[in-house]
């Protein structure tokens, strides 16, 4: 999952 509209970018970056 590189780009998930349901998951914020900062969440994906942090965890």
Swiss-Prot record:
Do the record's keywords include Secreted? yes
Q: Which domain of life is it from?
A: Eukaryota
**Where is it found, in Gene Ontology cellular component terms?**
extracellular region
Instruction: Alphabetically list the UniProt keywords.
Output: Cell wall, Secreted
Query: Any idea where this protein resides?
Result: Secreted, Cell wall
* Predominant cellular place of this UniProt entry's protein: secreted
| Keyword Secreted attached | yes
Q: What is this protein called?
A: 33 kDa cell wall protein
Report the source organism: Phaseolus vulgaris (Kidney bean)
Mind giving the lineage of the organism this protein is from?
Eukaryota, Viridiplantae, Streptophyta, Embryophyta, Tracheophyta
């Amino acid at each position: 999952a590189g780009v998930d509209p349901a998951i914020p970018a900062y969440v994906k970056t942090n965890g």
